[in-house]
Amino acid sequence: MKNRQFIVFALLLACPLLLHGQETSLCGKESCNKGYIRHPWYGKKVGYIGDSITDPNCYGDNIKKYWDFLKEWLDITPYVYGVSGRQWNDVPRQAEQLKKEHGEEVDAIVVLMGTNDFNSSVPVGTWFAEKEEQVMAARGETKKLETRKRRVPIMTNDTYKGRINIGLSHLKKLFPDKQIVLLTPLHRSLAEFGEKNVQPDESYQNKCGEYVDAYVQAIKEAGNLWGVPVIDFNSVTGMNPMIEEQLIYFYDSGYDRLHPNTNGQERMAHTLMYQLLSLPASFLSLIHISEPTRQAEI
């Protein structure tokens, strides 16, 4: 078992070197050349749930989206359901549509949502409600009823955490054997889309007195509470429109410092490609160990 873990660990360490120059190193053949590793998400079918950052109609052809880069680099088939302006209470609807249209053929689902919940001042809320109940238990003696506190997830669209509970419960039930990956919301700065749509930068609280950090942190917590991997896009993309020099990654320094432009989307895609190396896209037999030779095929 230790040998197997060492082999897999060594292969993952080698991946950044093997992926240098995506077009030549990512193998799309039935069997990769010796010394090359197939990306675990190569050729997979992935559903994308989200808001304007994912929506193909947001700025149309003016912005090439992150999932489009992944299609190009990893031959991923994208099923895109993100819609501009949507919040976590729209996750069940998008998930239902994905299930209806692509059912069991989808391999994995990526969710990037939450920035509009912050902008709309949805209260963060709490994850659980607690109450005392009786439960049968035994610790070295005859089992008996004991009174203990029990927590149950709060399912409500009135709070951010309640919406996440509903959304992830829905996704887990619709796709119990599929990989589901959460991405934390990106940093945000000024967006001014008209007299009735002005969004201050993230140095300001929203109307319910919360900074965007609370909405990012909730996604991280949700990963542990629901057993879902989280990629901290807020951090690992390295993009922050609050830094003037980094506005090269955002659509317009004058009125839209919120949406990543094509350069920003490409950086998101690069980040996601490498982060996904550590996660299986599906839960079929990904690794086969030949005991006599102790060689791994991925």
Which residues fall in each region the model found?
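Glutamine-centric residue-chemistry signal
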Residues: 5, 22, 94-95, 265, ...
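Serine-esterase "nucleophile elbow" of acetyl-processing enzymes
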Residues: 21-84, 95-104, 244-245
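Glycine/Thr-rich phosphate-binding loops of Rossmann-like dinucleotide-binding domains
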Residues: 56-57, 87, 119-120, 190-191, ...
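Bacterial N-terminal signal peptides that target proteins for export
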Residues: 1-7
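Single conserved hydrophobic/aromatic residue that forms the stacking wall/gate
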Residues: 287-298
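Short, glycine/acidic-enriched loop or turn micro-motifs at the edges of active sites
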Residues: 54, 235, 294
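Alpha-helical cap/lid subdomain in secreted, periplasmic
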Residues: 73, 94-284
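Hydrophobic h-region of N-terminal signal peptides that target proteins for export
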Residues: 12-20
